[in-house]
Amino acid sequence: MEKIFKQDNFISLDDCKTLIEYQKNNSSNNELGEVWNNRAVTSYNNQIWVKYLTDKIHNKIINMCKELYNQTVYLEFSNLVYWGVGMKLDKHADNHYIDDPQKPHYTPNRDYSSVLYLNDDFTGGETYFSNYNYQVKPEPGTVILFSSGKDHIHGVNEVLSGERYTMSTWYTKNKNHSLTP
């Protein structure tokens, strides 16, 4: 079973602030954003200046997968996510349904998942791993990396006050399912 990896100070506080501002300015209020389970989700594939920063982050995580897990992976999908008061995410796996493992999942090619925390001026919102009785208190610039399957069933505790911002990213071992050519 692969471990959950956590690295503090993965990116600078200035980079965290840049991504938060981008998310705030490009959320579901315009064509770049969407809403998923009441959370404003922002993509950034066509914004060159923010793409430079996110590519740098993705490449660092891809290199971490190689070093930590001896796996070559490719970017599958990534987004910036706003979590307001009352928002949470029930426990789940990122590549199969935990209540019905035989049911085809809509993202079966996700092999590794990462969450990059962009702020900590909120209460609640911890990421928890039910298989390990382990939770991560978000701190700006900290990243967690873990395999996407049944070994790492996880969720997010309810945000009790403030606003939580994260960058969620998934990686695949199958180059044919890569977001980038």
Predicted segments with their positions:
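Fe(II)/2-oxoglutarate oxygenase catalytic core
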Residues: 1-143, 151-181
